[in-house]
Amino acid sequence: MNLRRSWRQLLQTLCLGLTAAALPLAAHAQANYPDRPVRIIVPFTAGGSSDIQGRLLAEHLGKLYGQSVVVENRPGAGGHIGGKFVADSGPDGYTLLLGSIGLHATYGVYKNLNYQPARDLKLITIVAEMPHVVVANPALEANTLAELTALAKAKPETLHFGSAGVGSSVHMVGELYKMAAQAPIVHIPYRGSSAATNDLLGGQIQLLFENVPTTIGYIQAKKLKALAITGATRSPALPDVPTAAEAGLPGLTVTSWTTLAASKDVPDALIEKISADLRRVYADPAFREGLERLGMTPVGNNPADARAFVERERARWNQVIETEHITAG
């Protein structure tokens, strides 16, 4: 018994010693972060709103760090291919995720996910909020939101709207329109916003409820027509486009948002360090103006506030999922 107790004491001492030795190493690694390139995983195709934000963030964060910050697109499954990749990326914090409503708030549409975003990802900040814009192919026989609703009711299930995938913000805002207007339109999911936008331009679909950054160039070039903005106020980027409330549909007042997140295995101290670094990026007028030019409102809050915000949004969007019986299988 004494021998067994001695071995147990020896093992406990060794474990404590190893833990104590590891603490200074971990603290040193965090203090020197980053000492090599950082990746921002954008879980959607290039050219969409998330990709645009990711590249702007990478540019300014790279300047701050004096290290390369690169964007890597990993699309699929409504963003969850990229989300799972980051969740499994380990504790070093060198692989970050540009997240979205679909990743953090509406993942309940996927019944067989092999990870749980709320459990397996740690939020660092809300990057930005932005309204959506209801855009149509110029050939559509509707120039206002009221005309769109009348057309949808007159020709039920003949109008099709695209999205970046089931559960994406572009999809969910379309579903919110269906609820608010009682408009029988049909959802067509795509692998990303770029593919959906291309089909809208080509006339294969008639509508998108897309983020402003993805569509503003086409609207300004008159290749697409904007019917309404979903924000509470008009967008400075599209000042002539009325809000949904002004157009008679206040139930479509909504914004989407993006996040920066990391694996749950990243220590809280490193999460807080990255958050503090981001606040320095947000203090740069050039970064804020870059977001604002694209119709986005910069946020840059701390991890605790980001978590509270996402929890409120998850509850809100779950109501839409349940009411519309939305599922991706």
What is each stretch, according to the model?
Residues 102-112, 176-180, 207-241, 318:
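A ligand-binding cleft/hinge motif common to bilobed small-molecule-binding domains
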Residues 129, 215-283, 312-315:
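C-terminal lobe and pocket-closing loops
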